[in-house]
């Protein structure tokens, strides 16, 4: 999970929205849960209430069977092994689906520069418009800082 001090989390997303983002399906038993909301993504062994995880490697089937995630993106071969109460989001490519979902929860920041009031930036420094400079940082003369850098 990204550090929320640096990355803003979007959402929550409903099950219907998650299915659309990931191009995933659910078993008929969960069709009535399309309005259920999810707040984040997390690894199998760390996921909890309101969170979605994924299984893409049979090495982690044990963690999948024990997960406390609210839902889990899985290949159809593993869907029937989901723990009771865990929604199996069925995808032929669960890792790719999880990546899409993580991008939805943690979208790229819009390219707006943020420089803390306590930061010192030399007049000759060149900062990309997407750079963020935190409290008490010092950017010296002639320094060039590229896109999406957080200091």
Put a short name on every predicted segment.
Residues 54, 114-151:
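Structural signal for interior beta-strand "rungs" in well-ordered beta-sheet cores
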Residues 1-118:
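Terminal amphipathic alpha-helical/low-complexity segments used for targeting or macromolecular assembly
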